[in-house]
């Protein structure tokens, strides 16, 4: 049984352990879960809502596929990254989770980066503290002391669902690293940042391996879900490391890519290195071990598929994406000099958090038409992702293969071939 704890819904999937075949899936709710925004820039969700919809999704997928809970041999969990869940000694949720897209702790992270110094932060954390989980917890300490004083443990979203299933509060090294609570040099929780923030390390959950026994379903959780008591939870990872794992991206030189609304490139390195300009994030990958370093380097470009969607909208002809791809393919590579830079969806970290906006260059009214715009937009997206790949290469990652799901921008031969040509990497597409 695989669980995906997303921002919009909870998905449950059944996979045959022998054949790898997906038996069935279900999601809850059928619409979208609410994001609570008490103030501009804030984003919260109630963790108990995740748990309620997890129960519904599990019960639904078992019933719809006529599967008895006793047939489930193991449970794996993928989840939205970076969120902060706080519970008391009774494991009761103390406040809404502060989720990944909440920006209230940005300045706290900036102050820590300046206070500790760039060299110290990057050499130990491989990242700026930024707006990640540790900084969100510091925000709670500064602004909600009455809540902070009651906290017994803090968790990530996937840790919370695992806790509701098993009764055990656990996390992983990969999970701590995505919260910027992992010291890559020392190989332990990041005391330098925790001490700077005045956070007691005892608030952190004990770690378990990403793969392996992490607890078993309690009788109470079994009664709520239809699972069998004693069913083991054996895997958990954040959504981006998990996506890389699903594409068999486990070794140096292998890259996982997505190009939906935003684009993500996630590469694996066997070195403890950082970008001096902090344009990318580094996390402990799912198959890391002390004897075999596997770190995941992640970069995001906000303006990828959303720009293609904008082109589709302004074309105003009820075009399908497949038709746009065909039209784009009628123009030669290079779009006869037309350039489109896809940075129109907010600040881009790979550009030092600047927000240049989308721009069109070299437009000639006598040469360029709709087909040129469609192609130039897709080429611009490919070059934006390659800019990030070059940062990885500067960090010592040798890019050999890019693996992606058959979805979104990768359905376009123009986009896929452009990315392959400029990166020099083979592109392999999979049904995921």
Language-model features: locations:
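Active-site core segments that coordinate phosphate-bearing ligands/cofactors
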Residues: 1-2, 14, 106, 113-170, ...
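N-terminal glycine/serine-rich phosphate-binding loop of ATP-dependent small-molecule kinases
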Residues: 1-95, 107, 123, 150, ...
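Residue-level structural signal for beta-strand termini and adjacent loop
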Residues: 27-28, 98-99, 175
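Conserved residues at the C-terminal ends of beta-strands
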Residues: 78, 210, 405
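Active-site neighborhoods of enzyme catalytic cores
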Residues: 80, 214, 346
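Carbohydrate-associated surface elements
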Residues: 102
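A conserved beta-strand/loop element that lines the FAD pocket in flavoprotein oxidoreductases
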Residues: 202
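Short linear loop/turn motifs
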Residues: 205-213, 325-328
């Amino acid at each position: 049984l695989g669980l995906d704890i997303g921002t919009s819904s909870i998905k449950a999937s059944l996979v045959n352990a022998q054949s790898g075949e997906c038996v069935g899936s279900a999601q809850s709710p059928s619409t979208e879960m609410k994001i609570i925004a008490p103030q501009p820039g804030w984003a919260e969700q109630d963790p108990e809502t995740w748990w309620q919809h997890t129960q519904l999704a599990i019960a639904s997928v078992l019933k719809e596929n006529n599967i008895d809970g006793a047939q489930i041999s193991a449970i794996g969990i993928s989840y939205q990254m970076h969120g902060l869940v706080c519970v008391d000694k009774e494991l009761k949720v103390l406040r809404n989770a502060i989720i990944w897209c909440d920006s209230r702790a940005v300045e706290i992270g900036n102050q820590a980066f300046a206070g500790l110094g760039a060299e110290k932060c990057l050499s130990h954390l491989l990242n700026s503290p930024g707006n990640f989980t540790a900084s969100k917890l510091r925000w709670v300490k500064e602004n909600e002391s009455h809540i902070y004083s009651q906290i017994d443990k803090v968790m990530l979203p996937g840790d919370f669902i695992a806790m509701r299933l098993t009764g055990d509060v656990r996390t992983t090294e990969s999970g701590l690293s995505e919260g910027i609570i992992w010291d890559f040099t020392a190989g332990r929780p990041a005391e330098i940042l925790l001490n700077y923030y005045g956070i007691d390390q005892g608030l952190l959950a004990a770690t378990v391996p990403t793969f392996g026994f992490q607890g078993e379903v309690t009788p109470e959780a079994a009664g709520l879900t239809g699972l069998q008591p004693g069913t083991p939870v054996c895997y958990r990872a954040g959504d981006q490391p998990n996506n890389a794992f699903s594409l068999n991206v486990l070794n140096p030189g292998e890259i996982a890519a997505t190009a939906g609304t935003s684009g993500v490139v996630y590469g694996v390195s066997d070195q403890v290195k950082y970008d001096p300009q902090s344009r990318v994030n580094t996390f402990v990958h799912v198959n890391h071990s002390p004897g075999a370093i596997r770190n995941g380097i992640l970069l995001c470009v906000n303006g990828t598929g959303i720009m293609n969607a904008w082109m589709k909208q302004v074309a105003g002809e009820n075009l399908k994406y497949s038709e746009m791809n065909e039209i784009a393919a009628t123009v030669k590579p290079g779009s006869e000099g037309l350039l489109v830079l896809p940075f129109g969806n907010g600040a881009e970290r790979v550009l030092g958090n600047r927000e240049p906006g989308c721009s069109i260059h070299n437009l000639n009214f006598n040469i360029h038409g709709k087909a040129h715009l469609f192609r130039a937009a897709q080429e611009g997206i490919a070059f934006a992702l390659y800019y990030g790949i070059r940062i990885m290469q500067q960090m010592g990652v040798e890019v050999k293969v890019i693996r992606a799901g058959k979805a979104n921008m990768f359905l376009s031969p123009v986009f896929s071939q452009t990315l392959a040509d400029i990166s020099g990497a083979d592109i392999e597409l999979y049904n995921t």
